[in-house]
């Protein structure tokens, strides 16, 4: 699926991630501060291959990737990771557009609910998700266990 949005300045396209996008996506994730010391983004890209690749979307403007969202679905719940838009393109509804695109794909797969994690001190992102109808799950505690160390 390709979604095209035209505005007065340029045409933006949402399409599936392709392997040749790797370097550009990694650079964008750094620019968007989506990289944390606890994960290896190159390994995340390799691990995504073969697991719901149709849910990994990039936003392209004039042949340059300016946004990403990585969705997942296990048949029970959906998950969203790596939602980000280049700082020069923020404030134009593009993150919301990417989020809606992956939500639509998840809905088409029969996904009843989406979960996501946000670092607790990332108030700007928390506000964004609250504006897009995501609610804090006060009745749930996120637990995690590392099975493979990313060095």
What is each PLM-predicted segment?
Residues 26-39:
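Helix-loop element at the rim of GNAT/NAT acetyltransferase active sites that forms part
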Residues 99, 106-117:
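Conserved GNAT acetyl-CoA-binding A-motif
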Residues 55-67:
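Conserved beta-hairpin
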Residues 47-58, 79:
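A short helix-loop-beta-strand connector motif used in the catalytic cores of GNAT acetyltransferases and
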Residues 12-24:
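A short beta-loop-alpha structural element at the N-terminal edge
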Residues 85, 91-104, 131:
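Conserved acetyl-CoA-binding loop-helix of GNAT-fold acetyltransferases
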Residues 116-125, 144-148:
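Conserved beta-strand-loop-alpha-helix junction that forms the acyl-donor binding cleft
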Residues 64-72, 79-84:
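Conserved beta-strand in the GNAT
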């Amino acid at each position: 699926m390709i979604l095209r949005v035209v505005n007065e300045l340029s045409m933006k396209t949402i399409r599936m991630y392709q392997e040749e996008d790797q370097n550009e996506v990694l650079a964008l994730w750094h620019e968007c501060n989506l990289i944390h010391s606890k994960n290896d983004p190159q390994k995340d890209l390799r691990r995504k291959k073969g697991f719901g690749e149709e849910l990994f979307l990039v936003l392209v403007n004039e042949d340059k990737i300016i946004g990403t969202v990585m969705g997942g679905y296990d048949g029970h719940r959906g998950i969203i990771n790596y939602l980000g838009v280049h700082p020069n393109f923020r404030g134009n509804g593009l993150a919301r557009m990417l989020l809606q695109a992956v939500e639509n794909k998840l809905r088409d797969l029969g996904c009843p609910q989406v979960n996501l994690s946000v670092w607790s001190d990332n108030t700007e992102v928390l506000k964004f998700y609250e504006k897009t109808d995501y609610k804090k799950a006060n009745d749930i505690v996120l637990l995690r266990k590392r099975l493979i160390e990313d060095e």
